[in-house]
């Protein structure tokens, strides 16, 4: 049985693990913290705008397991909020245990608190990876889904310092780039002002610290829009955030809250003293990042170069997924890239032809997005911005599951991930 090791247990790594395991591989997920899903533990937004199409494409391709979980655990469905339609918000406090149960049911080995810090190579082949305590882990194929956030030095250098986010680098150690340890060069995104990286685009408030009126609004509608006084409006934050699909004027002129179990405040950070001056926020307290009044994690600091099969350029048995594989924003994007990486990892290990998704599908078009001169300042997401507009122009924004299945069937790819 082929052995596949996945480094990083976020949404992309989990998606890769499920796909590789269902192709018969022996799969191990090495995650540096004590939780799977990483930023998925504080995200929660699914199926908004073009992400609906991408979710249905994944389901038609055979990668529906994780969407079944997020759909089942959604606190609100079919929600329209500023700039976004038909969104679902999953319960970020319940999703990780459910995903962990799925992996155990499938027989996937989960290695928590296992930070991979080095690699061993023979030419262009990775022969093993080394954990922080010196253990050597061998495999036929490796998949890197370590993300692109931090570590602390980058958040200090290119942000406002460590914000004490869900990744908890001070406790579990910094992210290590496997591609760089293997001798490859990574890319870093740039903001319009030339500063590297981009802030995570939201912070989470304990719902109980909000007024009863706001809590009831969130429980009923799933979101709330609270106008800001002019003196508290800061439009500069919009260009600093990773989530350009939420870099719209309403997100600067208002506090927009989304109910994901926490109250998700759609701003990278917000001075706590100023926040408490807004009606309904007099007792507000941040849950993630703990220093959300000062800053947020800095992302897109370590993106690898890959081909259309998700294979790292320069290494023959390493594949990439999630933010490690491109300037992609969101859980759906992570699941999409990870699913293909996991499937192709199993194909590679078995000596079978790998799959490149066609551009007749939104996922295939996303993976084929080409860099321009300003490519390092661009973000790609099904949910908004430039790429969502491209989806609509190309007729890839399909809102009926039967239309999505028809497009997948036309490429003879129905349930391909399970064949």
Protein language model features and the residues they cover:
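Residue-level detector of alpha-helix initiation sites
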Residues: 10-11, 35, 324-325
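FAD-binding beta-loop-beta segment adjacent to the flavin cofactor pocket
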Residues: 242-249, 294-328, 371-382
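Predominantly flavin-linked oxidoreductase catalytic cores and closely associated redox partners
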Residues: 110-250, 262-270, 274
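Conserved N-terminal/central alpha/beta ligand/cofactor-binding core
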Residues: 25-26, 30-118, 151-154, 159-201, ...
